[in-house]
């Protein structure tokens, strides 16, 4: 007999928290996805009006990851800072790289920094 969605949800509801964490990690590995991406995608739906009203964003570097040199180069290119200043900004993470920028520019900068290996948040 095949399991229904209801059966699966009931089984998950009865699982201890640590088992749920392991289940999520196994699902992420098996399907090549991350739960944080799903949560981030669902968040605007929950607060749709508030998210739609925001027009200016702060691009915040939360971590430079494993490739500090590439992140410094990306910060220099995006901000026009000198090498020393860009290095100081990157090493001071978490730190705002740009503040009060349009959504499109903020997303483009986030993409550039993430491609360089950084972890970035838009606020």
Swiss-Prot record:
Coiled coil feature spans: none
CC terms in the record's Gene Ontology section: cytosolic large ribosomal subunit
Superkingdom, natural source: Bacteria
Pfam families registered for this protein in UniProt: Ribosomal_L12 (PF00542), Ribosomal_L12_N (PF16320)
Keywords: Ribonucleoprotein, Ribosomal protein
One Gene Ontology term of the molecular function aspect: mRNA binding
SUPFAM superfamilies to which the protein is assigned, alphabetical: ClpS-like (SSF54736), Ribosomal protein L7/12, oligomerisation (N-terminal) domain (SSF48300)
Family matches, as Gene3D superfamilies: 3.30.1390.10, Single helix bin
InterPro entries: Ribosomal_bL12, Ribosomal_bL12_C, Ribosomal_bL12_C/ClpS-like, Ribosomal_bL12_oligo, Ribosomal_bL12_oligo_N_sf
One example of a Gene Ontology biological process annotation: translation
Entry's family note: Belongs to the bacterial ribosomal protein bL12 family.
Function per UniProt: Forms part of the ribosomal stalk which helps the ribosome interact with GTP-bound translation factors. Is thus essential for accurate translation.
Subunit structure: Homodimer. Part of the ribosomal stalk of the 50S ribosomal subunit. Forms a multimeric L10(L12)X complex, where L10 forms an elongated spine to which 2 to 4 L12 dimers bind in a sequential fashion. Binds GTP-bound translation factors.
Protein's recorded name: Large ribosomal subunit protein bL12
